[in-house]
């Protein structure tokens, strides 16, 4: 924290520095520190989507979609040797990271109506995701000239990693899903869904998880006994229950891992980094929800919900 009377600038507008004793605060002037420890970032990103859609018969839509998400990121960090706290020894570091995610989705959606009042909507689908990331970082120290504060001018390796901050990973998802909806005359609604998902973040015996949901809704405003209530413009009662899954854990949390980057007496080495658990599996949540949706004069809405989640 800075005291309010510490001025980061000199009277002539230049940045106050500990080098010439123009900085009167403790430690370093933050602006001076940033000037002598610059960091530059670059990021290039490409998003692309390609799809094909056909309607072989009335009400049936078959769609296949392919998406690619690519990103290339670099960073260059410098710490100039002339900066007071560096004692004449600079530091320079570079890092680079490439990430690619590929997604393919295939769906078949069939909608039809019988006798004008019975409406159906069915969906079947599949989705696969494959993601890869790799990167590196290196830092060299010992530079003795501000103009030559680069990797090649360092004399000692300060740090190095071919997994730069966890950027080396790969994972995959595979999903199959289905959904069905039915409504009678816009009054009674029923829907259900079923899906099964596999994640590479779990061991081979626990990668698959199955999840389902069922929902009911009654549009009371369509009933005759509410037709005369002009002030009540929306009245819906809904009940749903179902399960969902969560796989948001480390990419290799189920595996026992070792890690490099250690050294002993000048020799490189590895050490145990993680104790794996092959029994890790999907986190499952079961949610039941009861909701009442009300609308008054087409101006005021009121939603009341009760739910139980476990």
Where do the language-model regions lie?
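Outer-membrane beta-barrel "beta-signal"
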Residues: 214-217
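Solvent-exposed loop/turn segments connecting transmembrane beta-strands
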Residues: 200-206
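Transmembrane beta-barrel architecture of outer membranes
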Residues: 175, 209-211
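Structured alpha-helical segments in the cores of large, soluble enzyme domains
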Residues: 174-184
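Surface-exposed loop/interface segments of Gram-negative outer-membrane beta-barrel transport/assembly proteins
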Residues: 1-45, 65-174, 220-287, 293, ...
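Transmembrane beta-strand segments that form the barrel wall of outer-membrane beta-barrel proteins
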Residues: 190-199, 239-241
